[in-house]
Amino acid sequence: MSEIISKSNSFKKIPFYYFFLLLCLFDVNTSMQSNNEKNYDIQLPQLDDNNISIDGYLDEEVWKNAKTVSGFTNYLPVDGAKAEDDAEVYIWYSTDAIYFGVVAYANKDEVRSTLADRDKLNSDDYFLFVLDTYNDQRTAYAFAVNPIGQQYDGTITDNVPDRKASKPYTIDKNPDYVYDSKGRITEKGFEIEIKIPLKSLRFNNNSTQKWGFNVLRKVQHSRYWTSLIPLKLGEASFLAQNGKLSNIKNLKSNRLFDINPELRGAMSRMQEDKDFSSQTQDPLGVNMRYGLSNNTVLNASLNPDFSQIEADVAQISYEPRRALYFPEKRPFFLDGIEFFSTPTRLIYTRKIVNPVASSKITGKIGDKNSIGVISAADNFGPSISKMDVAAVNALRLKRDFLDQNHAGIVYTDKTYNDYSNRVFAIDGKIILKNKYSFQGQGGFSVTNNADNAGKPAPMWNLSANSSNRDWSHSFTSTAFHSEFNPALGFISIGDYVSVAAGTRRTFYGSKGNAVEKFTMGYRHTYNWSYDPFINGEQPLDWRSYPTFSFNFRGGWGLSTFIWYESFGFSEKSYQNHFYKDGEEYKPFVDRDAIINLGFMTTLQLPQLDSFSGSIKYGYGKDPNYQEWAPGMIELIEMKLYWNPSDQLRVNFRLNQQKNKRPTDETLVSSGTVPRLKVEYQLTKSLFLRFVGQYNSSYRDSLFDTSRDGLPIYFKNSDGTYIRAEKNESNNIQADFLFSYRPTPGTLVFIGYGSELSDPERYRFQSMQRQSDGLFIKMSYVYRL
């Protein structure tokens, strides 16, 4: 009994207002009904598509018999009012495709449209069609088209209403689907025409289909989102509010079967080389997709090209204790990636680095069960003939029940010689009255190697949320044991427990007011290492974040959050730090906590005729992590987008962070990353791109300010010590790409990339080439 009381003391350290905020989860007015009080059930006609051409003109006879729907209403940033610019949406289907036509009304001079590459409609007006083909209100297809027919597609899922979510939904635009679209600007606005082949969709095997459906419209000059089916803010689910497409039947069962051979070549040279040398030992590869049913797909690949054609955007870590996350970009893993999503990233396919062979099954089994399975041989060797492989597997199963609720399991394993790692977890989600959501995941990992037999290392991830149009409340807790290690997953920080609660209040301005919406919130977090939490010890860190945000008429936005924190010293993070006392090297121990106070402000610019962007600035007290001492931090983030013509796109990003010693204002560390991307769209499928990135990193010689400024030393693996001297690197990366991609999977890429170093920041006088290379990739999709 005394042990139980001891362990429960960790919860006594949590302030009482945490439990007050938790109770607030249930004080939301539950008298509000679901948004769709009307029955938005659209009965679709089935028509003959033999004589239709997708050309942006809705002049064929068949469009006169289509179902017509209109009456758009505002959704973001303020919901409810009738949209200033309405549109008529025409819908029908044939036995092997579904068709949409739009007649959009707008001031011709305010229509924003460019010859954008796929998925790059950020500066354009566009219509986004949401198709929940399983009608399960969990994941849906997103097909978007701008006024001249350029495309943007992906999958759409709900966001839990919290301070991090800028929209009630998330669109993963990495998956690409085959569909036809054309559009044209008219005197009254614009018209678009779309054909989505049923081969591009997954749906159940029922003889009569009912799909979830909505149409969103992005109006760039006002930055408003409008919706065809009226939507309300503050609901626990975006997808649950959508309407239905009914009476879909007599569909052809066209089995998906794609074969995608690819050919690639690469040459490179290092700093000491004059000539290029071939880097391609296995130039041929093949990918295959086969529809096991209408809603289950088998993917297989042999010697695929899993390289990326654009380098990751360099990131600067605000908190060095946390790992940086980079999204997946490789098409094989992106197809059906929604079937592997879990509350915690226990399946992170970028951990599968160079698979020589892989297979994947994703889809639905019946109406309630979904499955995702990946098996791969990850090759650490230089070629197929000299393979050194690890076997990796990932399994995700999920069972739906009671509308939007589900339960699921995750299993992954990786084996390589004497090493093995296995992860198992269960999870579930419950949504009640479309106001309350509860989500949880718990599991463990076991890691074995030649020297140690591992023990189960637990983890958990819990959240509870409630929301309505005016209020939202949240409670979360996440924990990872010190030995929890998902070999195929991603966690930003291990040996970690977090307990947090927050609340948010939103106010809405009257029509015509300068301020359309004002939101204020507060969030408080406590963090521990895992064992101290279990043992009932005091938190290592606490953090308080008041937040304020404004949406102004015309598309302007302003948000600010204040950080007030206490960070405790973690000896584990500084095991390699020593100071020299006489002839003795002594470790970093018993350091005081650091109190932080500062602010971060973001200004969102409106979408002007050809220009938009955002600027973020932060300043205040923050840890000097390099020396574990108080520091003064200054942060700048800038994103600027300029479209001087319909074909030219210029994107500029700047990330800069400086940390100074407050005593003498000397610079401890800094990171600066300007990045310029210029794209010229020659045709709908053909573009040229240049990306230039300058990554400057500086760290001063380190001193132990708590020990009279004694020098800091690092301990080498051989037991010797080295002075932490000044360190500086300035790397330049320049990439050029010719891209031809008429349809997803069929493409020609020709590229050149170079990496250079600059001895002094921004001098550009003594730059030295570190490496450069050429590559070509060609692939073609045979759709059988």
Where are these regions (language model features)?
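N-terminal secretory signal peptides that target proteins for export/translocation
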Residues: 1-13
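Bacterial N-terminal signal peptides
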Residues: 17-27
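Structural preference for beta-rich elements and adjacent junctions enriched in aromatics
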Residues: 32-400, 408, 418
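Outer-envelope beta-barrel architecture signal
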Residues: 96-98, 139, 190, 207-211, ...
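Short secondary-structure boundary/capping segments
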Residues: 160, 230, 314-319, 426, ...
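Surface-exposed extracellular loop regions of Gram-negative outer-membrane beta-barrel proteins
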Residues: 252-298, 391-447, 512, 517-521, ...
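Alpha-helix capping and helix-loop boundary segments enriched in small/acidic/polar residues
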Residues: 275-276, 320, 349-352, 384-388, ...
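Exposed, low-structure sequence patches enriched in small/polar residues
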Residues: 354, 362, 443-784
